[in-house]
Amino acid sequence: MTIKLIVGLANPGAEYAATRHNAGAWFVDLLAERLRAPLREEAKFFGYTSRVTLGGEDVRLLVPTTFMNLSGKAVAAMASFFRINPDEILVVHDELDLPPGVAKFKLGGGHGGHNGLKDIISKLGNNPNFHRLRIGIGHPGDKNKVVGFVLGKPPVSEQKLIDEAIDEAVRCTEMWFTDGLTKATNRLHAFKAQ
């Protein structure tokens, strides 16, 4: 099994660029930058895309330009065009249940209330069995404050932790392609930015 598509979830537009909900896009932006593979807008895939080589494998990158709750439209378009199965997709998203400075890989599972994941599961034919990379953003402590929280910008101290976790997650994703998922997972799950 190899990953053929890495998706970073986000809302489009400058007003959302620095918000917690866009942590997935921050990851893909950094990965594309590291691999010198600039993202370009591609209308037929409803997003910014690039093509990279990881561990000798051809991998597509995608940051949807749809709103978060329509992310599945972009993912399904690209998966269908390149004949990519759900278990060959890695979706990178912000995670309320992990603190800033932590990131974790996961295969399958529910959407945990995340509207981007919810739409992707739906558009992939109700198939939740894709890989996820969960970027911790913390929780506001009150479920009624979640929307404002994910659409807010983290303070500098939290942003630093999130950025460090993303940096480590990029390294571990590259390691996945060279040394396998188990080794990459063990390293990433032991990491906590201070």
Curated annotation (Swiss-Prot):
Binding-site positions, tRNA: 16, 67, 69, 115
**What EC number is given for this enzyme?**
3.1.1.29
Going by the record, the broad EC class of this enzyme is hydrolase
Which GO MF term does the entry hold, naming one? peptidyl-tRNA hydrolase activity
Q: Which GO terms describe its cellular component?
A: cytoplasm
Family per similarity comment: Belongs to the PTH family.
In its UniProt entry, what is this protein called?
Peptidyl-tRNA hydrolase
